[in-house]
UniProtKB/Swiss-Prot annotation:
Binds 1 zinc ion per subunit. SUPFAM superfamilies: Class II aaRS ABD-related, Class II aaRS and biotin synthetases, ThrRS/AlaRS common domain. Homodimer. Catalyzes the attachment of threonine to tRNA(Thr) in a two-step reaction: L-threonine is first activated by ATP to form Thr-AMP and then transferred to the acceptor end of tRNA(Thr). Also edits incorrectly charged L-seryl-tRNA(Thr). Residues 212-503 are annotated as: Catalytic. Keywords: Aminoacyl-tRNA synthetase, ATP-binding, Cytoplasm, Ligase, Metal-binding, Nucleotide-binding, Protein biosynthesis, RNA-binding, tRNA-binding, Zinc. GO terms for biological process: threonyl-tRNA aminoacylation. It is an enzyme of class 6 (ligase). It comes from Campylobacter curvus (strain 525.92). Zn(2+) binds at C304, H355, H480. InterPro entries: aa-tRNA-synt_IIb (IPR002314), aa-tRNA-synth_II (IPR006195), aa-tRNA-synth_II/BPL/LPL (IPR045864), Anticodon-bd (IPR004154), Anticodon-bd_dom_sf (IPR036621), Thr-tRNA-ligase_IIa (IPR002320), Thr/Ala-tRNA-synth_IIc_edit (IPR018163), ThrRS_anticodon (IPR047246). This is Threonine--tRNA ligase. One of its GO terms (cellular component) is cytosol. Its cofactor is Zn(2+).
Length: 606
């Protein structure tokens, strides 16, 4: 059995330095790759990295070094001159980390008062910044060798446990996330309990670099960004426009088949309506505002208010419910420049957004219908998925009673139908609890995409009503629902999941037709016209380039099918097909090829 590196007591991780005789009533955490063990190992490795940096750069000062998903980071200043480290510096830091780990330093915990710690670190302005954020009371630091840093822990007992680690990337980070403050160095890393697990993680990192949607998006001519336009504002190129349009069209039909009505709300609404909805008080920092004719307006960060206004255009009866509205709504949210990341984190995006107005007795059935719809989508794109219920956050509107009713409605819908789910305490939207649909991609990474939210609050705030069977006015429940989350984010995830090998039914260009010479061009154009009849996008590669170069260009853009036409194909009305996704080459008649493409489209059922 491996050594104990920490304990868990009442759900809290406690290191061996802090257990203080409570071992008998605590659950041991062994040195392995369990989530609890990795949390302790990685947090300790962040301190080991800081110790190495301090050894190499004696004037370095450190801010914070928390765990993040799959690893850790540390924010620090190299020196007063503002020196920035790069990827080339990581090797030397790793080498020093290994030396320090092999020294087998005991890691000790030091407890004191906030005032005493402030005095100890009086010449360290970044430590003073950390102390400002710590409430009064006992404050702890951890020491190993000649290095000491403020920290709550938990840590491994000795640096000997820190053998299998990798520093993965360098970034910049504003002090405390405040864009008006200085930019610090940030180094990310990860650690494991054994060599094989670390090697597998590194393999996944390298594979993720190859699949990076920002890189593939350029290669496939899907989208781009322009600093003159602004950060976080993607520009969709023709290939990307076709991809989005196909996705939108498929989902449009799927929504209509399920009884959803298309609507559209304005993108700019008076601030008064955002005050009424609660967004002004609870979400203002994420919104953009402007003044028109002395009145304040807010650009919508969500589509819910617009759909409420659609609901209010008529008196509604219980016979009308559930009433399902949907919109590909363009929304804008303020994101700090440091967190913008390709299509994953943008300032403008479109949601596949829907709001369902229903009676309380209809909640469960509608949630189950939504989950079935979501399952169909994930199945067609080859994603595994799981669900998580997010509960009331610290900043929220509505009473605890209403929140409990809404949260229980979500749990009951999942429980009664055997769905497994996790709980994210405090992770709900400010107006209601939600089910998050988290998908797993080909690299086993988890992404939060779709969401289902139960909302009793906004119907109350906007005094929504319907007339029941007894001719009395009742309050409807509002279900917020987005299945992809946003088109931008979902497309980015899909590109990385498939390594750019997009499914045939949404590929921007589905077929490239390569005539060997001009003598075969008319036949190529005829095939392109036939494909358009089935809504299949094709391109005739007739540039004055070599045959091999035209084929390589199509392959680089990951076009699913390439057909080559020469004298034999023209004479026999056939095609020489290279099916990229099936990894086959074959000859077939034109009729057979057209049937094959139609079959590929018909395989998709949303």
């Amino acid at each position: 059995m491996s050594e104990i590196i920490a304990y868990k007591l009442n759900g809290e991780l406690i290191d061996t330095q802090s257990i203080n005789g409570r071992e008998a009533v605590a659950q041991p955490v062994y040195f392995d790759n369990s989530p609890d063990a990795l949390h302790v190992i990685r947090h300790s490795c962040a301190h080991l990295m800081a110790q190495a940096i301090k050894s190499l750069y004696p004037n370095a000062k450190f801010f914070v070094g928390p765990n993040v998903e799959d690893g850790f980071y540390y924010d620090f200043r190299v020196d007063e001159a503002g020196t920035k480290l790069g990827e080339s510096d990581l090797e030397a830091i790793e080498k020093k980390m290994k030396e320090l780990a092999e020294a087998k330093f005991e890691i000790t915990k030091i407890c004191s008062t906030k005032a005493a710690m402030s005095e100890k670190f009086k010449n360290d302005d970044l430590k003073q910044e950390v102390l400002k954020r710590i409430p009064e009371g006992e404050v702890s630091s951890y020491a190993q060798g000649d290095f000491e840093d403020l920290c709550r822990g938990p840590h491994v007992p000795n640096t000997k446990f820190l053998r299998f680690f990798k520093l993965t990337r360098v970034a910049g980070a504003y002090l405390g996330g405040d864009e008006t403050r200085e930019m610090l160095n940030r180094i990310y890393g990860t650690a494991y309990a054994d060599k094989a697990s670390l090697a597998e993680h590194i393999r996944i990192i390298e594979e993720a670099k190859k699949r990076d949607h920002r890189k593939l998006g350029v290669e496939m001519k899907l989208f781009g960004f322009d600093e003159e336009v602004g950060g976080g504002l993607p520009i969709w190129l023709p290939n990307g426009g076709r991809l989005r349009s196909k996705l939108e069209q498929i989902l449009y039909k799927a929504h209509r088949d399920r009884g959803y009505e298309p609507v559209r709300g304005p993108e700019l609404l008076k601030a008064d309506v955002w005050k009424r909805s609660g967004h002004y008080a609870n979400y203002k920092e994420n919104m953009y505002f402007t003044t028109i004719d002395d009145a304040e307006y807010g650009i919508k960060p969500m589509n819910c208010v617009g759909h409420i206004k659609v609901y209010q255009t008529e008196i509604r009866s219980y016979r009308d419910l559930p009433l399902k509205f949907f919109e590909y709504g363009v929304v804008h949210r303020h994101e700090k420049s440091g967190v913008l990341h390709g299509l994953f984190r943008v300032r403008e995006f479109a949601q596949d957004d829907s709001h369902i107005f229903c009676m309380p007795s209809q909640i469960k059935q509608n949630i189950l219908e939504i989950l079935s719809f979501a399952g169909k989508i994930m199945q067609n794109f080859g994603f595994e998925y799981e669900m998580e219920i997010s509960t009331k956050p610290a900043k929220a509107i509505g009473s605890d009673e209403i929140w409990d009713i809404a949260t229980n409605a979500l749990k009951e819908a999942l429980d009664e139908n055997g769905f497994k789910y996790g709980i994210d305490e405090g992770g709900g939207a400010f107006y209601g609890p939600k089910i998050d649909i988290k998908i797993t991609d080909a690299l086993k990474r988890k992404w939060q995409c779709g969401t289902i939210q139960v909302d009793f609050n906004l119907p109350e705030r906007f005094d929504l009503g319907y007339i029941d069977a007894n001719n009395e006015r009742q309050r409807p429940v509002m279900l917020h629902r987005a299945l992809l989350g946003s088109f931008e984010r979902f497309i980015g995830i899909l590109i990385e999941h498939t390594a750019g090998e997009l499914p045939f039914f949404i590929a921007p260009t589905q077929v490239v037709i390569v005539p060997i010479s001009d003598a075969h061009l008319d036949y190529a154009k005829e095939i392109a016209r036939e494909l358009r009849k089935f809504n299949i996008d094709s391109e005739v590669a007739s540039k004055n380039e070599s045959l091999n170069k035209r084929i390589r260009t199509a392959e680089k853009q990951r076009v699913p099918m390439i057909i080559v036409l020469g004298d034999n194909e023209v004479a026999n009305r056939s095609v020489a097909l290279r099916d990229r996704q099936a990894r086959t080459q074959s000859d077939m008649s034109l009729a057979e090829f057209l049937n094959l493409t139609k079959e590929k489209l018909s395989e998709v059922h949303f």
